[in-house]
Amino acid sequence: MNKVFSDYGWEDYIQLQKEDKKIVKKINELIKDIDRNGYEGMGKPEPLKHGLTGYWSRRVTEKDRLIYKIEDDTIYIIGCI
């Protein structure tokens, strides 16, 4: 699948590369798992509600989440917060 970051998602990802390589490694593992398993797998995937209906989150750490959706053959990542 193709991976597309929103501007905010990319900023989050770049900032984390400067701050915590361990979290970036976990995000990369989650993205690979999303590529293989869609909306199932690691990180306790959960559908989001309200203004983010259609998006899902996965746990990166106890407080941080990867926010994404899948359309056609593309993973859209809007946040790594």
Regions found by a protein language model. Give the residues of each.
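Compact soluble domain cores
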Residues: 24-37
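Enriched for short, Lys/Arg-rich terminal
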Residues: 2-4, 8-25, 42, 49, ...
